[in-house]
Amino acid sequence: MKLAILSRNSKLYSTRRLVEVARMRGHTVRILDPLRCYMRIVVGDFSMHYKGKPIDGYHAVIPRIGVSVTHYATAVLRQFELMGTYSPNPSDAILRSRDKLRAHQLLAAQGIDMPMTVFGDNPDDTQDLLSMLGPPPHVVKLNEGAQGKGVILSEKNSASRGLVEALRGLYANFLVQEFISEADSADLRCFVVGNQVVATMRRQAADGDFRSNLHLGGSATAATASEEEQEVAVRSAHALGLTVAGVDLIRSRRGPLVLEVNPTPGLEGIEATSGTNVAIKIVHHVEEMLATICSSNICQP
């Protein structure tokens, strides 16, 4: 298999692990910076160049796309798709998951439970918007934030109103959610590959914080997700069109609640904590999907 990995940084742990495992499996692998890919769009002739040379002949591409380059990098991924290259996470699926509002709407439509969420635009509606949510504490989230950045806990209604008005003044898109106190500032990261959860870790927020992201000083321990939690995680990934995803859940009195579905979850924390070789699970999944495609006589390139 000729495999491309879309990544801006070849030194990142996740990128290095995927390259290492794929080469160990006998595949030809190349890391491509999506911002150095440029494309020609012509009826019947989708093509792409990278640093002055044509890109062609790739059987699969694994996207490791950062939030800041989502728009351009998904256009590059879409061009790969139009050229007949398989991706475990298609461009449209990444766009769905990166837009928190859209993702929440799609998940709720599939009967997947989440913290109650409200969204609005006009400042005149702020008070009624918050009343739809219920009493504080409230969690205010930027619509396109990542790694816990742009997530604020508001413990008073007046503070929530002030935050909402300030963010609107900055023309920022955001959601406001109920705060689930019984989660005790912890969540589960369920790593989905294909139709199963291949690894799980429990993340606990640092003292004085409520965000459990490891990038913000949270800690992680090995965990086992219940059958219900695994089912919810897989359904959440598939509802957005993803086959590789990090699904973040919290445990509540009404069952598991989905916080977020990450289309490019990091491998370092989950592999170190769970002891699972997640990278090889991803490469195996790509191999299996390509075999299925080829057996259907539509194998490209």
From Swiss-Prot:
Keywords annotated in UniProt: ATP-binding, Ligase, Magnesium, Manganese, Metal-binding, Nucleotide-binding, Protein biosynthesis
An MF annotation (GO) of this entry: metal ion binding
Top EC class for this record: ligase
Binding residues annotated for Mn(2+) 2, in chain numbering: E260, N262
UniProt: Mg(2+) 1 binding residues: D248, E260
GO terms classed as biological process: protein modification process; SOS response; translation
Binding annotation for ATP: K141, E178, F179, D187, R211, S212, N213
Family stated for the protein in its record: Belongs to the RimK family.
HAMAP family assigned to the protein according to its UniProt record, in alphabetical order: RimK (MF_01552)
Protein name (Swiss-Prot/TrEMBL): Probable alpha-L-glutamate ligase
Organism: Xylella fastidiosa (strain M12)
Name of the gene: rimK
